[in-house]
Amino acid sequence: MFNIKNHLRLPIIGKREPEEQPDPIDHDLHVQRLRELLYGLDLMLDDDAQGVKSAFSDDTVESAVGRSGSAFYNAILGLEPKAIEEATEALYHAEQVTEERKKHFEHHDRPIGSYPAGMELQLCLSDIYLMQSALGFVSDSIVDSMKAAYRIRKTFLSFSKMMEHVRDVQHKKETGEIKSLSPNATFIDEFIESGVITGYGVLTFLVSMFPPSLSRILSLFSFHGVRKESLELLWRASKYPNIQGAIALLCLYAFNAMIQSLGSIPPSNYDQELEHCLQAVKDIRKRYSKGALWAVMEAKIYFLTGESQMALEMEELSIDSSMEQIIAMKGFDTAMLYVGMRKFKQAADAIIELEDLNSWSHAFYRYFAGCCLLQHGKEILGSGGSEEEAKASIDHGIEYLKNAPTLVQKKKKRRTLPVEAYLIRKVQKWEDRAEKLNISIADAMDVPPYAELIYIFVICSLKDPKEAEALRADLETCKCSEEDEAGLKEFLLGVIDRHLKEYDSCRVRMEHVLQLDQGYLSRDNRELWILPFAYYELAALYWDMHGMAAEKEVNHYLKKAQEFNDYDLQNRLSMLAQAATQTLQSEK
């Protein structure tokens, strides 16, 4: 007989229908997926592109996070617009799915370890925010840069809150309040702690490098970065045997080998930090034995510590890497090493090879190669070599120099890089002078352009007295018919004097440079940049002579250097001055 009760559910008066229960969360599966995430990212740092693709091939949240991390890694190494765009899209997708998963954990789960439920996903989300901010700052879009400034504040608040949790939990572990944990809980705790310490360290370090104008605005929101604290956190995080420890070491390398190596006011313990970095890189190469990036880093540090021959031997070795970005990074470092060692033909060859690997700035590659080939030709003549070979090298160099600005003009929907604005001005200045005097571009150059490249990119090579004396010899033979060229020559000789500890001569030269008229230097593509940099070099002079005893004088000259505007290399000086200011604060 048909029974309506079997086919129709009627509500029971006075009783609520039970709520639908969420799907239970499988903690073992969750931990396993996080382990697979770390494993896939380890493969990324070991140059196993196919392994990374396979590890993150499914549609889980963890794979989305892994794919976004891999895309970011590719983008930040090469800074190519297409890679940045792809990484931005991958990060956006990862953000959406991670946010949804995090909310599910927070509302329907219990903690696995010592931290609130879902905090490991909040960490992933904060890492995504941090990567998005970094891409915004290096993109060619002003709008993206503004978005990045807003997003980084959100990231800072997230990491600050998580850092409070980590400090509290680690204190309880030290006092015995939290005792032994299950394997899953131990893994989750280390996942969170290594990630939070690394992320907070990276973030506060980045903020410490912001220019003063932006730092003052951010400080109104209790948003600040102290370099000393951030570096201590990064060294602490670098001990973790996972991707987070590797990222911490990469950041330490970036600071010591890429930022400080460009400046003139290093921390008092800089040499020890480089040695510490070198040992840490050697250790991590045991973990990532196939990762070419770590070999490139090791070679660069050898160069910075004065072991140029060891660096050269490593740079000249071929590397087996599936990542063109790492091969390009190696090529760039090799070119800088060659020019620092006055191997100009090899430097030109190394930098031109990057055109087939990287689209960062073909204009700069041509300009750099042109400067090197010009000097190579001059050295052939100076040593009594073949005039035909010398002329071919000089002509080839001039061709590259003339071609460089046209490559900037061909860029579509991309801002002109500061170094491109610099090279456009230099080439235009030489062409105008050559036309005015009816001479060749090569003859229109009073100061050999490679000398500026050494100051801008390879100033560390001047630590070697032999290299400093060789550059001095080239400069002293220059005959300058233009006042700004004479000022440029005097500036570069002053820099050499400081490196050779001829401090009185350095001060006299820099003060002479500062007597040049700013209005005159601001016109006709002249060398305005030497004025602010002369103040910066005076700060470096007092730092070399007296250290923290001259804090007042160093600060004074750094502030004077930052009073100038609207000149090429302004962004570079801002970065170097901010790094120097943080050095003074860290030494107290």
UniProtKB/Swiss-Prot annotation:
Pfam families: Iml2-TPR_39. One of its GO terms (biological process) is cellular detoxification. GO terms for cellular component: cytosol; nucleus. PANTHER family: TETRATRICOPEPTIDE REPEAT PROTEIN 39 FAMILY MEMBER, TETRATRICOPEPTIDE REPEAT PROTEIN 39C. This is Uncharacterized protein C11E3.14.
